[in-house]
Regions:
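A conserved regulatory-domain signal marking ACT and ACT-like small-molecule sensing domains
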Residues: 1-214
Length: 214
């Protein structure tokens, strides 16, 4: 049997924005990874570490797995993870570097590691870090994720291809390291088709391009 912690009336208003954040973070990570998950490592930092995190953990697991399989929900998520031999590790830290609360996830799959963090800003979900790169990106309905070598010309070429396809950029958020790696999260108006993704993958210095929906 699964131990899903019930949400009482008093804590519901506190948990609601965090449940939304966890759902968005789970969908984000699940859409990025490409191979079977072996481990989901979740760290709650700051104020969120002191509240009832059981439903948040279930929400994260359910959202990650639901991008790859059907009929996953808050009730059965941890059971399914166990059946799939996915190890769930949770940890808690009282302090955060720059936010009141932060949730960090490290996904380990058969072929890759992907870590990212999120936080709430005025009740809305934001991605604040991807693979150690700081970024500030509000999660929206249709987005594009890019990973690339940080060289001149990439952003211009990307913008040109999107413009040619009549895809409008609403927001553009960039994260980068000092060692030549960069990621971006781009909010776009409307959905991006697979044909356009193939064109974007041919841009110089691209490592990965993913269309995201939330």
């Amino acid at each position: 049997s699964i131990n899903v912690s019930p949400i009482n009336i008093e804590e519901a208003p506190i948990l609601k924005p965090y449940l939304d954040l966890c759902q968005n973070l789970g969908k984000f990570g699940g859409q990025i990874i490409e191979s079977n998950i072996k481990e989901i490592n979740i760290t709650f930092k700051g104020s969120v570490s002191k509240i009832n995190t059981k439903p948040l953990i279930s929400s994260l697991i359910a959202s990650i797995l639901s991008t790859k399989m059907e009929s996953i929900n808050l009730i059965n998520a941890e059971v399914v993870a166990k059946q799939k031999n996915i190890e769930i590790i949770t940890s808690f830290q009282d302090q955060t570097e720059s936010h009141d609360s932060e949730i960090s996830i490290n996904l380990i799959t058969e072929k890759e590691k992907f870590n990212f963090s999120g936080a709430l800003f005025a009740g809305s979900s934001r991605i604040i870090s991807i693979n150690g790169m700081r970024i500030e990106a509000e999660i929206s309905k249709n987005m594009l994720y890019t990973s690339n070598t940080d060289k001149p010309g990439f952003i211009g070429a990307l913008g040109t291809e999107l413009g040619n396809a009549e895809v409008n950029i609403a927001t553009f958020n960039l994260g980068r390291t000092g060692s030549g790696e960069a990621v971006s999260l781009i909010e776009v108006d409307g959905k991006i088709n697979s044909e356009l993704i193939k064109k974007l993958e041919n841009i110089s210095n691209v490592k990965s391009i993913k269309k995201l929906s939330f």
